Regions:
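Hydrophobic alpha-helical transmembrane segments of multi-pass inner-membrane transport and secretion
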Residues: 1, 207-244
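Flexible glycine-/small-residue-rich
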Residues: 16, 59-63, 111, 132, ...
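Hydrophobic, regular-secondary-structure patches
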Residues: 1-58, 65-68, 79-85, 184-185, ...
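Short aromatic/hydrophobic contact patches that present stacked aromatics
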Residues: 13, 88, 165-167
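Solvent-exposed, non-transmembrane alpha-helical starts
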Residues: 20-26, 49-51, 56, 67-72, ...
Length: 244
């Protein structure tokens, strides 16, 4: 499970508060020592409309050529174009199955960002052609996340280019606490969160589950051992009587 989560999301994300992330920091030796891949991205929440059905989605945007650097795109279960062209969209396997959407189909994406008209504020709508289908191995990701070109996303959601996130893919994603400490030293004015922060409740639940299972197994072993010892004790007593 952890491997799938790490494989789908960036290991750490740097968000800027008020201005673009400094290029000097991005090119720093300290960051290059930690990471093996850096990508700029942006995201927004919208609604997919297809064949009379609607579905809320988290849309993530990448540049045309950077999209193919994601692990899910390199995955052998990925089908379609590995470039993220303008006016095209990449959706998950679960979403494709549930809505009967195939590569080449058109879908409508609605944004909460409005267009001012004489009758009031209307939400933006754009039509995209499904260009690829990914399979992360986690149904929650596959049915709730989609990818579009980052420029299309920023136009659709009225997002500022300077507020793009920096996604950091670490050389050793399991040493996340050490990496976060180092990243805070590099990006001291920005907000940093990691894959561990995003999934804290899930990992806490898994830890509790492991502890409970350990206790249950320990009790089963103790009861089984007690039964074996009791059985042997009774057998020895019976044999002792027979010998006597």
């Amino acid at each position: 499970l952890i491997e799938k989560i790490i494989g789908f999301n960036a290991h750490a994300v740097v968000k800027t508060y008020d201005q673009a992330i400094s290029k000097k920091r991005i090119k720093s030796k300290e960051l290059n020592d930690l990471s093996n891949k850096l990508l700029f991205s942006n995201s927004g929440e919208g609604v997919l409309i297809n064949k009379g059905y609607t579905k809320g989605l988290l849309l993530r945007g990448y540049s045309r050529n950077k999209f193919e650097k994601l692990d899910i795109v390199k995955n052998q279960n990925f089908h379609g174009n590995r470039k993220l062209n303008s006016k095209f969209i990449s959706i998950g396997k679960e979403l494709s199955f549930n809505f009967d959407i195939k590569i080449g189909d058109k879908v409508l994406i609605m944004s909460p960002s409005g267009i001012q008209t004489i009758i009031g504020n209307l939400p933006k709508q754009e039509t995209y052609i499904v260009d690829s289908i990914f399979d992360s191995g986690l149904s929650d990701f596959d049915q709730n996340i989609a990818f579009i070109n980052i420029k299309d996303l920023e136009n659709l959601f009225d997002l500022d280019k300077s507020k793009r996130f920096l996604e950091i893919y670490l050389k050793d994603p399991k040493k996340i606490d050490f990496a976060k400490k180092k990243l805070k030293e590099i990006f001291n004015q920005e907000y940093i969160y990691t894959w561990s922060d995003l999934n804290k409740s899930l990992f806490s639940a898994l830890k509790v589950e492991r502890n409970v299972m350990f206790i249950i197994l320990t009790l089963i072993i103790i009861v089984a051992a007690f039964n074996i010892i009791s059985g042997l004790t009774i057998l020895v007593k019976n044999k002792t009587r027979e010998i006597a």
